[in-house]
């Protein structure tokens, strides 16, 4: 097996496959949409990032189908390198060639700008609907909901200029997520995503209008928790809006 892979269930390539199956069952990465990447924070080189490829059924993904990059953005390994000219999955046509996820530059932005340990991109219907209900807004806000406490309280360190977690958000806090407009090609979202990350240091996610959401965290498990918590809050927000209940309590 390549030095980039391991049989350990906690290895990033194996975790991506596990999470893709889970997210598929949640309806977040259907039809080959969405993507996951994990930085090998506990490995010998914490700058190594594993990224799920483009155009693959996420629930059928295999570890060796991952692309491997090194921050700030060099591709070290392609699944085409080990395929002998044929795909690694019997699901794919023999002429299939693996392509890096179109999310790759956006994932790398989260790692380079926020020192993230994992970045998740889903096509959650709750995320899409929330951006449609508030189509005239450039940010999504919500307060006084218990689930907000699952999200990190982030601040800019005055000495380093880096965004750091200083605790967890509290019940009375207001969650604010930036909303950026979608583009015809995923990679064209990169500049808007980077601007949102810069302008919203307290956010751990960016909504993409009529598209989905990008969520990151300091570890893969934190990113998973943040993604689940935000999706819960977005689903609740849709119901509150339909019932005429303000999302931010005065």
From Swiss-Prot:
Instruction: Select a single GO molecular function from the record's annotations and give it.
Output: methylthioribulose 1-phosphate dehydratase activity
Enumerate the catalysed reactions: 5-(methylsulfanyl)-D-ribulose 1-phosphate = 5-methylsulfanyl-2,3-dioxopentyl phosphate + H2O
Give the positions the UniProt entry annotates as the active site: 146
Question: Which positions does UniProt annotate for substrate binding?
Answer: 103
Q: Does the keyword ATP-binding apply?
A: no
Instruction: Describe how the cofactor binds.
Output: Binds 1 zinc ion per subunit.
Top-level taxon in the UniProt lineage: Eukaryota
Group of enzyme by EC = lyase
Annotated binding of Zn(2+), by residue: 121, 123, 211
What keywords does the record list, in alphabetical order?
Amino-acid biosynthesis, Cytoplasm, Lyase, Metal-binding, Methionine biosynthesis, Zinc
Q: Name one GO biological process term.
A: L-methionine salvage from methylthioadenosine
E.C. number, please?
A: 4.2.1.109
**Which co-factors does it depend on?**
Zn(2+)
The entry's cellular-component GO terms read:
cytoplasm
Q: Where in the cell is it found?
A: Cytoplasm
KW Chloroplast (keyword) present: no
Q: In which pathway does it act?
A: Amino-acid biosynthesis; L-methionine biosynthesis via salvage pathway; L-methionine from S-methyl-5-thio-alpha-D-ribose 1-phosphate: step 2/6
Function noted in UniProt: Catalyzes the dehydration of methylthioribulose-1-phosphate (MTRu-1-P) into 2,3-diketo-5-methylthiopentyl-1-phosphate (DK-MTP-1-P).
Q: Which family does it belong to?
A: Belongs to the aldolase class II family. MtnB subfamily.
Q: What is the protein's name according to its record?
A: Methylthioribulose-1-phosphate dehydratase
Tell me what gene encodes this: MDE1
